[in-house]
Amino acid sequence: MAVNLNPPQAGQLPAVAGVELLVAEAGIKTPGRKDVLVVKLDKGNTVAGVFTRNRFCAAPVQLCQEHLAAGVQIRALVVNTGNANAGTGFDGRARALSVCRAVAERDQLQTEQVLPFSTGVILEPLPADKIVAALPALRQADWAEAAEAIMTTDTLAKAASRRLDIGGKAVTVTGIAKGSGMIHPNMATMLGFVATDAAVTRPMLNQLVREVADQSFNSITVDGDTSTNDSFILISTGQSGAELIDSAEQPAYQQLKQALLEVAIELAQAIVRDGEGATKFITVDVNGGRSVAECKDVAYAIARSPLVKTAFFASDPNLGRLLAAIGYAGVADLDVDRLSLYLDDVLVACEGGRNPAYKEAQGQAVMNQSEITVRVELGRGSASARVWTCDFSYEYVRINADYRS
């Protein structure tokens, strides 16, 4: 059951000029459901991406990186669900390449102008023949349908959009994502595609995709597992008529970055809210560190702890688990006497131990909520970090135990 999350509405997801969405049913895993998405891009676009750091990265991830590095203009993306094409060796690469080739031939493109993406079961051969056979049946779709076409264990589709004004020109940012389990940076079993009609040079788009990913998709965890297929793609079509963004010093750069961040954070949070079996959405804020890195270490120690997450599921104010997680986060020479721990606005621990004024009823009241903030004040610097996570429920175990059955 998703936590305070609603399915996207097509009317709230404006089209992005220069982007065409098409979907089809290939019967990869579930007959009759949309499981192939093709994103066609007009000439003059720019594409950037960041990908999983898992050493067993999937064949389509490898091809995406190679095609982007080739320097050709990307004109199409092809996404399949139901099969990850990971752990499939040379054969998996050949199958992914055959899908790229078929999409390219359909639209008179070079194979290198197509980026492939897959998500689903690992160690299974990609049914490339089914995907290729479904291409003639592709039909136009809106962003909401596109979001549905990339779902796996997601219970709800995920999409977001923003509109902004750059120099008197209307600019649109719209994106979709999928993910529900195996979520932990960098990045997650996550596919994210965000498009804008703003005009951005390749160097600036590469910078934007990294900055946006770090503050959104790289700040979430559901279960601490890092997928083989993570991909976050940023597309600039340049068709809004707004000024070209070619420097991070331009006000337009910051305007666009803010809109992209809002969309990406909404998508990233939706993944956590739809975490497999999630009943609670938890924000972990860590402040007062010497570096962002150590703040994130503390935040993730809390956010991925099974003991912490099961306590949240049970609404059990067993908050010593939070202190234990902070203690093993690996922060060098941490002075616990200067640390403060809050549950929402309730001061739970300070000066090395339990706050004398803290009452368990206060903690219980917070733990009963569906949305909770854990705040840690390290008291040793000015850096901060924020991470989003969810609880562990019985349903998480059931979903993953039954995943292939």
UniProtKB/Swiss-Prot annotation:
Coiled-coil segments: none
Enzyme class, spelled out: transferase
Pathway listed: Amino-acid biosynthesis; L-arginine biosynthesis; L-ornithine and N-acetyl-L-glutamate from L-glutamate and N(2)-acetyl-L-ornithine (cyclic): step 1/1; Amino-acid biosynthesis; L-arginine biosynthesis; N(2)-acetyl-L-ornithine from L-glutamate: step 1/4
GO biological process: L-arginine biosynthetic process; ornithine biosynthetic process
Signal peptide: none
Active site (record annotation): T189 (nucleophile)
GO molecular function: glutamate N-acetyltransferase activity; L-glutamate N-acetyltransferase activity
Annotated site, Cleavage, chain positions: A188, T189
Compartments, record wording: Cytoplasm
Listed NCBIfam families: ArgJ, PRK05388.1
Assembly behavior: Heterotetramer of two alpha and two beta chains.
Role summary: Catalyzes two activities which are involved in the cyclic version of arginine biosynthesis: the synthesis of N-acetylglutamate from glutamate and acetyl-CoA as the acetyl donor, and of ornithine by transacetylation between N(2)-acetylornithine and glutamate.
Stored PANTHER family: ARGININE BIOSYNTHESIS BIFUNCTIONAL PROTEIN ARGJ (PTHR23100), ARGININE BIOSYNTHESIS BIFUNCTIONAL PROTEIN ARGJ, MITOCHONDRIAL (PTHR23100:SF0)
The protein, known as: Arginine biosynthesis bifunctional protein ArgJ
The species this protein was found in: Chromobacterium violaceum (strain ATCC 12472 / DSM 30191 / JCM 1249 / CCUG 213 / NBRC 12614 / NCIMB 9131 / NCTC 9757 / MK)
Gene transcribed to yield this protein: argJ
